[in-house]
Amino acid sequence: MEPILHIQGDAHSSLTPLIFIHAVSGLAWPYMALGNLSNTSDPARSRPVYGISSPVYSSELQPHGPYLLGGWSMGGMIAVKMAEILQAKKETVQQVILLDSINPEKYPAFVNEEEHRIIADGLFTNVCQAMGMADLADDSDDEDNRSDASDASDDGSTMSDEEEEDDNLHRLFSTMRRHIHASTLSISSTEPGKLLPPNSVCHTSVTLVKCTQLSETVPALFSARQRCIRRCALHPTLQWRPQNFDRFRTLLIDARHDSLFDEEHVEEVTSMLRQILESC
């Protein structure tokens, strides 16, 4: 997983960079589908846009504010927490962009470990399929054989370039599987007030890009939990409390959560992001 992914724009631009945080997979690759987020076709004058695989890399990109943060799904949840942490350090966060991100404080906990495992495995399979790597979904956690192959040099043999590339790819997907399991558990165990204290104010503007279509499947096995997740998805602000921010607005898009970066919708998402960034 690349810790910092340069998505587009001039790295030396005087414009404030937009930093996207990874979604549940731990990868920032979905943001690569976005079109030009600058109102210019001149690469030398375009806003730099990055994706990061961990919040800690924001300081490497930008030691001090003002910050522009954003994220899809879990990435938006993390962006809100990052904004609070940065402001506690006296940094300015100009804008947080939530791409269909539900407030995790309202997200229901898993009923049991089995539900968590099944749902996390299902999400992992979906990500693999979206990346055109469906064949890796079933064997990415089979570390023993790959460990033996990686250690082959100990007995004097070496892997071919093709074998090494295959080994690295499987290790990437194994890491992604573990990340999805840890991330889904983290989201479902976020207690009220853990992300933002109820009466606190995070001094930033927040724009929520909300999908109006419900996903075809709900990540839950039990009906009570399914209903709770659907209520969250139908909520006008996806359960965020506008009073927790200086400014909160919602933009609607006729799409489903998992299709935001598909060819059918990505042009509209790009246009929305350009509109948001015009004032930044």
Swiss-Prot record:
Pathway(s) this gene product operates in, as recorded in its UniProt entry: Secondary metabolite biosynthesis
Function: Thioesterase; part of the gene cluster that mediates the biosynthesis of pyranonigrins, a family of antioxidative compounds. The first step of pyranonigrins biosynthesis is performed by the hybrid PKS-NRPS synthetase that condenses 6 malonyl-CoA units to an acetyl starter unit, to form a 1,3,5-trioxotetradecane-6,8-dienyl-ACP. The enoyl reductase (ER) domain of pynA is likely to be functional during the first two rounds of polyketide chain extension, to generate the saturated C-C bonds of the alkyl side chain. PynA subsequently forms the amide bond between the acyl chain and L-serine.
EC top class, as a word: hydrolase
UniProt signal peptide: none
Gene3D superfamilies for this protein: alpha/beta hydrolase
Biological processes annotated in GO: biosynthetic process; secondary metabolic process
Region of interest: Disordered: 136-167
Family annotation (SUPFAM superfamilies): alpha/beta-Hydrolases (SSF53474)
Gene that produces this protein: pynI
Name of the molecule in the record: Thioesterase pynI
Record bears the keyword Disulfide bond: no
Organism of this sequence: Aspergillus niger (strain ATCC MYA-4892 / CBS 513.88 / FGSC A1513)
Highest rank taxon of the organism: Eukaryota
EC nos: 3.1.-.-
